[in-house]
Amino acid sequence: MKSFTKPALGAAVVLALAPLAAAAGDALTIYSSAQPGAIRPEQYRNGVSGPAVPGYAVVRHLRMLELKPGRNTVRFTDVAALIDPTTVSFESLTDPKGTSVVEQNFQFDLVSAQKLLEKYVDREIEVDQVRGSGVETFRGTLLSTSGGLVLRRADGGVQLLPHNAGVRLPELPGGLITRPTLVWDVAAARGGRHEARVSYQTGGITWWADYNLAYAEGTNANACKLDVGAWVSILNQSGAGYTDAKLKLVAGDVQRARPPGYAAGGLPAARMALEEKVAGFEQKAFFEYHLYTLGRPTTLPDRSTKQIELFPVARGVPCEKKLVYYGLAPGWRNVQPNPITDRNYGVQTNKKVDVYLSFQNAQANRLGMPLPAGRVRVSKRDDADGTLEFIGEDTIDHTPKDEKVLIKLGSAFDVVGERRQLAFSVDTSRRTMSEEIEVRLRNHKDEPVTVEVKENLYRWVNWKIVEQTHDYRKEDARTVVFPLRVPAGGEQVLRYTVRYTW
């Protein structure tokens, strides 16, 4: 039998077998996935395996059990299959000082057809094999189960049989269990009824936030409003279900040690009125993270996904729509350790103009609460029939209150860009180079648009724009942004010259 064992404190005789009684209460603290939106719907719908789920939880069980004075064996089968046995804790709340764990085992040698056969290697079995319209029975000693059944008959001959043959075993061998089981050797100073708490970490369970945004046009082409709703999505593939459990969620990047090579404030009055009817999540700061506690018990069946409302819909949140043109093709945006003097480096163009939405996570905007990392889906109402149509999605990281949320929706259909190099020169003796860039934006809409042209000055860290046709602002050490107004059905042209020195 496979087991995880803590060293015993001394030899003793087991006096009693004390199975744990029915649950008095379960509690889970689930830690947010480091990869919001990393699990696609088709993955968990088709049964993504528990070890592939990028999250974990701390599970706590309260159980009532009968102990005798002295040594007791306690078995606990209501345990997650993906438990980390090194994190298991057993504690008697009735007599914590007089009750101690001498030895702890995690048994996971689960019964299966293959395991049963392996237990009968070098033992005699009977195998029924269909032969035409009849059945032939073979008796012999099982030598191997690899690639089929290998039997040594009484006459010394060897019989090879397929795995799907009908095997008859005289009895169920010992040492096999139907569910993962924790077994404790408990020393109790006091006998009688004890309330015990069992806790452990398990994989195969995670949570993330799903935000549903309804977009509406504002007073101009860039202004807009959003209705922001948020739900918590919980995926449980841990190998255990949790009934009427107390639920807490932790948002934040909590550090965990991994083996090498491992892959894996107050509420507005309108909201309070709703929460009096159905208890929702209460949020508070917790260490350097945020803790969300559900005000009611909930049930999380194994191999299931559950959604719970994180907060009621915040309506009419002011937002801004931006068109951003990043003309440098994606493959050429990396920073290099030396000046890039190759004139053909980065001249490839990207024609797509990206569409972004941004809003401030502020109380004045009917938000102002920590937003956990998750997926953001945006829809817009079709005035013809009143239905909401999907217009894009993105993921966001953990976002504190009063910070800006930026969402990329996709690329504009009617606005295109083109970037090209007009001139380039290098003077290696003076350690200088000069490059002239032209950006053309074409607007096929019936209304003017504003496009932010983002230019990455990627050739070297020391740069100066010596000529330009439009004003710009510096976004960071190597990026500038030119806001351009493009007329309806027209074109706007930007030219600038940058000089690098090293």
Outline where the language-model segments fall:
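GHKL/Bergerat-fold ATPase module in large chromosome/replication-associated machines
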Residues: 9-12
